[in-house]
Amino acid sequence: MSSLVRPINLGKINNSQSTVKDYILLMKPRVMSLVIFTGFVGMWLAPYSVHPFIAGIAVVCIALGAGSAGAINMWYDRDIDSLMKRTQKRPIVRGVIESDEALSFGLITGFFAVFFMALCVNLLASFLLLFTIFYYICIYTIWLKRRSIQNIVIGGVSGALPPVIGYAAVSNTISLESIILFLIIFIWTPPHSWALALFCNDDYKNCKVPMMPAVKGTVYTKKQILIYSILLFIVSLMPFFIGMNNFIYLIISGILGVVFLYYAGSLFYDTPDNKQAKRFFAYSIFYLFFIFLLLYSTNTISTIS
């Protein structure tokens, strides 16, 4: 794949410029914060009790695991990151962290995350965390991202697993409840990512990453976004119907879902500056956060004690 992009020049790196902030940025803190939150909600919804200290260790391990995957992703994608406006300020591209240091950092943090999850929490949660890191790096980043138009769809498995890990950290099981949490994020990921791809289309074309708008065009992409948005609306109501959350959840999640559908439909009337795509992308982040906040606040079970 090296022929698809020009190599990044890392010859001007000055290690003394590296700061704690740079290593935090290497771990993709925005993504990591959502991973931590959804993982915590998964823990909260498990119908078992766990000591807060163990819960805290589990959250830290999930955070480190997500950061590990993010760091290794930046290491592998450093060539295309240098070509995209959206990613040109990442630490490796700016030259404040060497690529081999980023890889070592990612591997070490990932090892400790999985190890301490196994040592202090349970083996199932540790295995799921290991699988998530492996899937994000090997299946999504290395295999799918630069090869398949379905990169986001298939690769979305890793981003949807944190609440399953959190649930398993408390219950040592995988249940229907945790699978529904998984499905909400899994189905949310494609429309969220394709909205980003709509207004970053030139970037993806420039580095030859086969995102759907670049390969199939914007109209086809918008149709797919609408289809997934309808599926998301249906799946997001399931926690109420299996007794996981109360009637308040049903009403508010339904309203949020209708707004999500409105923004998805508005994409067909977007302006050349992709104003609606940007609005939809921003709302999709708010939507997922608020859905999981609702899952947390309206659940019919209590766990962490």
UniProtKB/Swiss-Prot annotation:
Localisation per UniProt entry: Cell inner membrane
Catalytic reaction list: heme b + (2E,6E)-farnesyl diphosphate + H2O = Fe(II)-heme o + diphosphate
Class of enzymatic activity (EC top level): transferase
Matches recorded under Pfam families: UbiA
GO MF annotations, alphabetized: protoheme IX farnesyltransferase activity
Keywords: Cell inner membrane, Cell membrane, Heme biosynthesis, Membrane, Transferase, Transmembrane, Transmembrane helix
CDD domains the record matches: PT_UbiA_Cox10
Membrane topology according to the record: Multi-pass membrane protein
Regions annotated as coiled coil: none
Involved pathway(s): Porphyrin-containing compound metabolism; heme O biosynthesis; heme O from protoheme: step 1/1
EC number(s) given by UniProt: 2.5.1.141
GO biological process: heme O biosynthetic process
UniProt xrefs under InterPro entries: Protohaem_IX_farnesylTrfase, UbiA_prenyltransferase, UbiA_prenylTrfase_CS, UbiA_sf
Keyword flag Membrane: yes
Transmembrane segments: 31-51, 52-72, 96-118, 123-145, 151-171, 179-199, 225-245, 247-267, 281-301
One Gene Ontology cellular component annotation held by this UniProt entry: plasma membrane
Entry keyword annotation includes Transmembrane helix: yes
Record's miscellaneous remark: Carbon 2 of the heme B porphyrin ring is defined according to the Fischer nomenclature.
Family listed: Belongs to the UbiA prenyltransferase family. Protoheme IX farnesyltransferase subfamily.
Task performed by this protein: Converts heme B (protoheme IX) to heme O by substitution of the vinyl group on carbon 2 of heme B porphyrin ring with a hydroxyethyl farnesyl side group.
Protein name: Protoheme IX farnesyltransferase
Originating organism: Rickettsia rickettsii (strain Sheila Smith)
